[in-house]
Amino acid sequence: NYRAVTRMTAQRVAEMVELIRGETPLAQWPQEWFAVADNIRRKDLLLGNTLVPGEALEVALARGAAATLEEVRRSGLRGRGGAGFATGQKWQACRDAPGAMHYVVCNADEGEPGTFKDRVLLSAYADLVFEGMTIAGYAIGAAQGLLYLRGEYRYLLEALEQTLQRRRNQGLLGVEIMGVKGFDFDIEIHLGAGAYICGEESALIESLEGKAGRPRIRPPFPVTHGYLGQPTTVNNVETLAAACLVARHGGAWYAAIGTAKSAGTKLLSISGDCQRPGIYEYPFGIGVAQLLADCGAASSTQAVQVSGPSGVCL
């Protein structure tokens, strides 16, 4: 049934077994069992934003595609999926690449153990993500966006589809968006099937095309030969959400936050032996000591594992 059940205990498992044996319809199960908490502990620029749907897009459309892309370059925004590649540089390369079609792909295949920031953005800030995809489409000259949703996040699908339909009804997706002639853009959601490797962008594109999710030999890169062999920009959920802030407030505003080499803020998924696990948003440059103090792990911590099981211990 693709429903997520949280906060499992021995008692809850026993109760579930009885409901299953009794063939009790899922609709009659306690609905609190299916509640997935966002558990946001600290908000900053992104999680604390007050943008309304269409606000950032309207500014981008008024500025123009080339100027919007320049603001993204000026902002210093880097990919939030791990590689840290300059977003503006990627968008520019995709825009400049020849092709009959250009595509925007949102990588929502959040499979790294211990990471749940993208899930929170998709459940509580979906408008921001979809608007970021639309702005990216405008900047690179794409008419189609594809969100590749992790198979384990299928329970989010209905709400995400409802958000997309609302945006279409509001004129924020579809034909001649916000009355701009020639700017047509829409978004489809594709479900993954649980393969960890599909978090890698070329394997993700293979999966989108209906093939086995295996990484491609590179070069060529997706920005020139991506989805269906066409120029494609693949960006992380958080990257696209942050692009909305850049579009709305400008590159210089965003670049002034964080550090000289890493602009803006970052969402951190904090879990393990701490009193307050959850999502924390900080400007780049924060020290580990402050993070430990904020999450309630400052007194007895011996090591901090960074980047999940495949990362390192500090």
PLM feature segments, named:
Residues 1-314:
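Feature of Fe-S/electron-transfer and energy-metabolism proteins
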